[in-house]
């Protein structure tokens, strides 16, 4: 049986890697970032470390923070509408799996508007076009959402989660800078479970 391995375009690792966000944005001729980050990361200044790089390099952005620990259909819908109004042409996902998953869903729907309802992407998604380019900046270790082709969304109404698998949603750039890692208790529990199982 054949195995398929899919890799993102570029990954940067090490202290100071965050500075490469500006270089990559300029190299790709991106005009404005739609920054997806949860309220806690904004509150504790983690998001600002990324936006400081953008500010220093004169790069435009808009922040979207309607992201929950387990992103919902509503979070995605609001994000899609906000992205359309923003005039952005790429996404920067800052955080753990929740920010990454929200960004992937937004990016896929913007690029493939026929799948406006994220529930239609459950399972192996039948999209035709790559999502809006994503630069992923993980702040936790373990989810690997910055280099994988799936995302998980919560359907609050039906009290269930569903997985979308789509090779078109992988971030083009991953920035693994140890200075960005946070040690928040609510994500530490899941990391321990990864280690045990």
Q: Where would I find each of the regions flagged by the language model?
A:
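Conserved active-site and cofactor/substrate-binding residues in soluble primary-metabolism enzymes
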Residues: 16, 20, 28, 45, ...
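An N-terminal, well-structured beta->alpha segment
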Residues: 1-64
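A glycine/threonine-rich phosphate-anchoring loop and its flanking beta-alpha core
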Residues: 112-184, 190-193
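Hydrophobic residues at beta-strand termini and immediately following loops
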Residues: 12-13, 64-67, 164, 176
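Local beta-strand N-terminus motif with an aromatic residue
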Residues: 30-32, 88, 171
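N-terminal small/polar loop signature for handling phosphorylated ligands or for N-terminal nucleophile
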Residues: 42-115
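Conserved beta-strand elements of the Class I
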Residues: 34-35, 90-92, 135
């Amino acid at each position: 049986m054949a195995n398929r391995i899919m890799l993102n375009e570029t990954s940067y690792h090490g202290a100071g890697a965050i500075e490469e966000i500006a270089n990559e944005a300029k190299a790709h001729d991106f005009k404005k970032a739609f920054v997806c980050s949860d309220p806690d990361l904004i509150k504790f200044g983690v998001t600002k470390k990324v936006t400081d790089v953008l500010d220093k390099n004169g790069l435009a952005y808009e922040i979207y923070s309607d992201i929950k620990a387990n992103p919902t259909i509503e979070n995605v819908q609001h994000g899609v509408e906000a992205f359309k109004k923003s005039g952005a042409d790429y996404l920067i996902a800052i955080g753990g799996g929740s920010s990454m998953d929200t960004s992937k869903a937004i990016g896929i729907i913007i690029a493939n508007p026929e799948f406006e309802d994220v529930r239609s992407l459950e399972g192996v998604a039948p999209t035709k076009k790559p999502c809006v380019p994503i630069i992923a900046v993980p702040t936790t270790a373990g989810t690997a959402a910055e280099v994988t082709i799936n995302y998980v969304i919560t359907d609050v109404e039906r009290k269930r989660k569903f997985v979308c698998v789509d090779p078109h949603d992988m971030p083009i750039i991953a920035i693994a800078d140890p200075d960005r890692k946070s040690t928040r208790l609510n994500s530490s529990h899941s990391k321990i479970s990864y280690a045990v199982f």
